[in-house]
Amino acid sequence: MKKLIAICALALASAASFACETAIDPVTGLQLESVSTGWRSVGVVDGMNKLVPSVSFRLKNVSDHRLPSLQVNAVFRRVGEKGEWGSAFATAAGTDGLAPGAAAEVSVKSQLGYTGTDSRAEMLRNSYFVDAKVDVYAKYGSTQWTRIGEYAIDRQLIEPASP
């Protein structure tokens, strides 16, 4: 019985040690590549054109460990304001995780934006238009959300992807 308890204790200690050793800081373990920002048309809402801020990027695992259940949260803010203007959540890699050296394509857009009767291009040139920025956060497994990037939203229209 004592031998069984000793084996269980050793296995538990090894598992705890392994879990501690494999904790990867998202700031150093993930790399944002090919970041593209802009304003995406989400169609006509209540008779007006609607534009929302959007960000797309490749999220690369630069660590030497598989990162399970990799998630991304984008928080959009208008320049000069501290409060959240909108947010978007995406799963970059499911339970299989993101292998070392692998990358996932991520594209998210805010649910909030601007509406107007002007054309989409004219809306971006409007003197009352306020620029936006996005903070990108990531987490994997049971780790905490960590900010991995901040980007200005370019004042450009993002064309819809071809079918």
What is each stretch, according to the model?
Residues 64-84:
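Short acidic, flexible loop segments centered on an aromatic residue
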Residues 59-63:
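Asparagine-centered strand-capping/turn motif at beta-strand->loop junctions
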Residues 88-144, 152-158:
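Short, solvent-exposed, Trp/other aromatic-anchored flexible loops in extracytoplasmic proteins
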Residues 21-54, 154-163:
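Low-complexity, acidic Ser/Thr/Pro/Gly-rich terminal tails and inter-domain linkers that flank the onset
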Residues 1-20:
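Sec-dependent bacterial lipoprotein signal peptides
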Residues 53-57, 72-78, 132-134:
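A short beta-strand signature
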Residues 51, 68-73, 123-131:
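Short coil-to-beta strand junction motifs in C2/discoidin
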Residues 47-58, 107-112:
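Contiguous beta-strand segments within globular domains
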